[in-house]
Structure formats: structure tokens, C-alpha cells
Amino acid sequence: SRVSRGLGDVYKRQPFGASMVLVMAVYDSPLAKPKNLILGHILSALSGVIIFYLLGNTFISLGLGVALAVFVMMMTNTVHPPAGANPIIVILTGQSISFVFLPVAVGAFIIVVFAYLYNRLLKRNYI
């Protein structure tokens, strides 16, 4: 059915749930800021794609993918903890570079727009 096919991909978007918790509950944390959310997700997913293409789907590649993602986020000052799961999802499911753009970049952008509107409604300064 259409519903079961749609639910089959839900696990690929799990990090977004944790991102939502940050932007709604601790919106003033540096880890929840738009730059961190968007670039953290993009850079970590890209790290997963790179490691997958270099090493395939192995236990070592899973660890290296997460390590690379954390390193890149730290070096770019874009740490966003939920994004740390992206390399695992990318490697386990064998995603290509297109995954970085859709659903990752588009989804992260939508979360930022939602966070802005939600926090504005509550009269809180998100951006």
C-alpha cells in the first residue's frame, strides 16, 4: 500500500525528530541555530556519502562516517548532535549524493522555517 511504502522510509528521517526537539525546547542553544542545523545535517550526510563510496557498508565505515561528520562539524563550527546519525543512515542504506539534497537539505531548511514561525508565535527569538 501507499502508506506502508511511505513508512518504509521513515527511519531515513529520524535525525529530524531530534532536531525538532532542539529547535522547540532549547531554541536558544547554539546547537539549535539555523547554521548548525542546516550545515550540520548537510555536512554529516555528505560525510556518510563519501565514506560509503570509499569503503562501502562495513562496521569500520560506520564508525569512520560518524567520526568524519563530527570532525567536519567541529572544524566548521556547525555541530548539531542529531546530524551525527546521518552517516549511519547513508551508509546502511547506500544513499547517493542526491540524498544530501533531498531529503536532508530540504528537510533541514523546512525545520528552520518551522522553528522560526513556532518560536515567533511564542514570542521567542530563534534567529
Residues covered by each model-derived region:
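Single conserved hydrophobic/aromatic residue that forms the stacking wall/gate
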Residues: S1-Y11
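Structural signature of hydrophobic alpha-helical transmembrane segments
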Residues: D9-G17, I51-A69
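Interfacial segments of multi-pass membrane proteins
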Residues: M24-A25, I88-F99
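Generic transmembrane alpha-helix signature in multi-pass membrane proteins
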Residues: G48-F52, A85-L92
